[in-house]
Amino acid sequence: MEDERWKLSSSKGRSKSGRSCSSSSNYYCHSSDFNSSNATTLSRSYSASVTASRHATTAWSAAGAGGGGASSSSSSQHQHQQQQQQSNNSQRLSKKCVEAVKEHRARFYIVRRCVSMLVCWRDY
């Protein structure tokens, strides 16, 4: 969307001499080749970058406020996927811990039964 801003249309892309810049060489055209109204919109000066960043910030805040842009939905999907992966990892970890505890209890129970059996067998 921002790339469209920098492309020249046939009416705006005319220089004083009548030449126009092609879209591929758009980046090499100088603002001195254009009249003053086009120079402010086409030159990549500090004010143009500030305007572009303000536009991007406003678009981002509008999308975050319920505008529902594609970039905001993809980033929210990415965050949702990360949260799911973290919860899945924690669930796997807790499941492994529960299984390890159960196995430990089972081994302890078997060892305790064996020891009690050996103690009882020695008494007879």
UniProtKB/Swiss-Prot annotation:
Keyword annotations: Cell membrane, Developmental protein, Glycoprotein, Membrane, Transmembrane, Transmembrane helix
Entry-listed glycosylation sites: 35, 38, 88
A single GO BP: negative regulation of cell population proliferation
Residues that span the membrane, as ranges: 59-75
Region (Disordered): 1-25, 60-95
Recorded topology in the membrane: Single-pass membrane protein
InterPro entries membership: DVL, DVL_RTFL_regulatory
Annotated Gene Ontology cellular component terms: plasma membrane
Pfam families linked to this entry: DVL
Subcellular location: Cell membrane
Residue ranges of the region described as Required for DVL/RTFL small polypeptide activity: 92-124
Subcellular location, principal: membrane
Compositionally skewed regions (Low complexity) per UniProt: 71-91
Membership in a protein family: Belongs to the DVL/RTFL small polypeptides family.
Reported function: Small polypeptide acting as a regulatory molecule which coordinates cellular responses required for differentiation, growth and development, probably by restricting polar cell proliferation in lateral organs (e.g. leaves and petioles).
Protein name stated in the entry: Small polypeptide ROTUNDIFOLIA LIKE 3
Organism in which the protein naturally occurs: Oryza sativa subsp. indica (Rice)
